[in-house]
Amino acid sequence: MKIDKIIVGDHQTNCYVLTLNNNCIVIDPGDDYEKIQEKVGNKNIKAIIITHYHFDHVGALNNFKSKIIDYKYKDGFYKINDFEFNIIHTPGHKEDCITIYFEKEKIMFTGDFIFKNSIGRMDLEGGSISDMKKSLKLISKYDDDIIVYSGHGNDTTLKNEKNNFKYYI
């Protein structure tokens, strides 16, 4: 799987385009539709997944409306064409936060739940310290060598972040 990161909008949100064969999944199209569409090119968009509904993660979503069907993901395993992943509900930053885990590839897309050397804010509407602690405990059970792609900033490993968020749980 090829992973392209596109930094979009005033809040420097990471949007990801995952490509297998000529198909792709777009994660968090926060803004700058043209930049995202340029990266998508002539690939077939099979899904657009939002890690949580804050404006900086959904700003370009309406531009894709003709290409998608609204669907609320629940915890569990999903297979869309050749893409296989798990959705893990990880509230804390916001009640609707999800983490997208590709087990075979050992990668996670965490939105604003986990960042490199930090975790998401809990003082915004929908944030919860107790939910964040539960979500961090849940994610801490996953393998250390998983690469974490967050909603802002640089990539990291789950091992590095476990060392950081152990202070919160």
Describe each model-derived feature in a short phrase:
Residues M1-V40, T99-G111:
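Conserved beta-strand hairpin/beta-sheet module of binuclear metal-dependent hydrolase folds
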Residues D4-K5, N86-I87, I146:
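A short linear hydrophobic-aromatic micro-motif
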Residues I6, Y71-K74, I88-T90, G151:
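Conserved beta-strand termini and adjacent loop/short-helix elements that scaffold enzyme active sites
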Residues V8-D10, T19, I27-G41, K65, ...:
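Mid-domain alpha/beta scaffold segments of enzyme catalytic cores
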Residues Q12, C24, P29-N86:
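Active-site HxH/HxHxD metal-binding segment of metal-dependent hydrolases
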Residues C24, K94-I169:
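Metallo-beta-lactamase
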Residues I48-V58, I88-C97, Y149-D155:
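Histidine-centered catalytic micro-motifs
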